[in-house]
Amino acid sequence: MKIILFLTLIALASCELYHYQECVRGTTVLLKEPCPSGTYEGNSPFHPLADNKFALTCTSTHFAFACADGTRHTYQLRARSVSPKLFIRQEEVHQELYSPLFLIVAALVFITLCFTIKRKTE
């Protein structure tokens, strides 16, 4: 128990926060700086703007900001070739076979069948 508490304390002390953003490839993404005096760690062009904001060209990239208080904000940009909501008609939207709701129901049915078969064999 003490080891778990110690590991939890270490994880909280490191304070690494993750931010995920999807965007359309080739556009500019406007993000807010997590801390005003942070250090930028990344290899993509970074354009600081007013009001603690910055702009990046949307490509699949990974970068981070290290704040003065030791908190590290890690950003992951995922570029799409087109917008996911663009050109989608309502009648073309269909339910996928492996949606989370379907998988939960299938798992419950499977577990119920396993216990039913086990009781019949005993």
Curated annotation (Swiss-Prot):
Keywords recorded for this protein, A-Z: Disulfide bond, G0/G1 host cell cycle checkpoint dysregulation by virus, Host endoplasmic reticulum, Host Golgi apparatus, Host membrane, Host-virus interaction, Membrane, Modulation of host cell cycle by virus, Signal, Transmembrane, Transmembrane helix, Virion
Subcellular location: Virion; Host endoplasmic reticulum membrane; Host endoplasmic reticulum-Golgi intermediate compartment membrane; Host Golgi apparatus membrane
Virion surface topological segments: 16-96
One GO cellular component term noted in the UniProt record for this chain: host cell endoplasmic reticulum-Golgi intermediate compartment membrane
Keyword Transmembrane helix among UniProt keywords: yes
Pfam families attached to this UniProt entry: bCoV_NS7A (PF08779)
Signal peptide: 1-15
Entries under InterPro entries matching the protein: ORF7a_SARS-CoV-like, ORF7a_SARS-CoV-like_X4e, ORF7a_sf_CoV
Gene3D superfamilies in the cross-refs: SARS coronavirus X4
X4e domain sequence ranges: 16-81
Sequence motif Di-lysine motif, residues: 118-122
Domain of life: Viruses
SUPFAM superfamilies, sorted: Accessory protein X4 (ORF8, ORF7a)
Keyword ATP-binding found: no
Disulfide bonds: 23-58, 35-67
Domain notes: The di-lysine motif confers endoplasmic reticulum localization for type I membrane proteins.
Subunit structure: Interacts with the spike glycoprotein, M protein, E protein and the accessory protein 3.
Described function: Non-structural protein which is dispensable for virus replication in cell culture.
Name this polypeptide is given: Protein 7a
Native organism: Bat coronavirus Rp3/2004 (BtCoV/Rp3/2004)
